[in-house]
Amino acid sequence: DHTRGLKFMKERLELSGMEVIAHPSCFDEKMFGEESIGAPYSAADMAGICRYRPCGGPCNISERLVFLGEIPDAVDFETRKAIGRTRIRGKWQDDYVRDDSALVYRGEEGIFIITGCSHSGICNIVQYAQAVCGQQRVLGIIGGFHLFEADERLVRTIDYLKCCGAEQIYPCHCVSLRAKARMMEVLNVKEVGVGMELCLDGQAAH
């Protein structure tokens, strides 16, 4: 669910004029055991398919939308875990998914964060989004949080999101039912479904 959809996107759409923004490591080779789990295309392939723009740091997609690039490790309880291995400059090493990133919508009243799988840690992402955008108010978060167990990390994550004042939480994939149930006890958790439409600053976001 990270990059394999690109193959089907290429089959259905003309991508030559489309700009694709991603972390520079996004298209590196990745293995989990004996299985290849990386993107179907290399960075060189992408440069020939579309207007590929590697971004290791924050970059503006539009006046309101920001791609965060690589997320720094700042929150002590969000320790990264390796998921398989990746080949960097010809050498295989543990993959800590440094290419995991997020988008931020900069609204008039605060920020709205759109995550992928949050391998970087949802609290790390929130803290970095606030710093990059210079806004503390978190209107909402939607996406995967990579939370499965009802453990200490979940408890501390819930406390963090409560303390930072996250107003609406839309947990999608990568969040277990048990984790969602615990979050609902404290946070304003919203149901997410296909076709859901959010309205930010009076503009519809599909």
What are these regions (language model features)?
Residues 1-57, 71-79, 162-169:
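Active-site HxH/HxHxD metal-binding segment of metal-dependent hydrolases
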Residues 2-11, 96-102, 106-113, 117-193:
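Cap/insert and terminal regions of metallo-dependent hydrolase folds
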Residues 30, 62, 69, 75-78, ...:
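Short acidic/glycine-rich loop or secondary-structure boundary segments that cap or lie
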Residues 30-33, 149-151, 199-204:
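Short, charged, surface-exposed secondary-structure boundary motifs
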Residues 35-36, 57-108:
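Active-site-proximal loop/helix segment associated with metal-binding centers of metalloenzymes
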Residues 49-53, 64, 186-192:
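Active-site regions of enzymes building and remodeling cell-envelope glycoconjugates
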Residues 189-206:
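Short, basic/aromatic-enriched C-terminal tail that caps enzymatic domains
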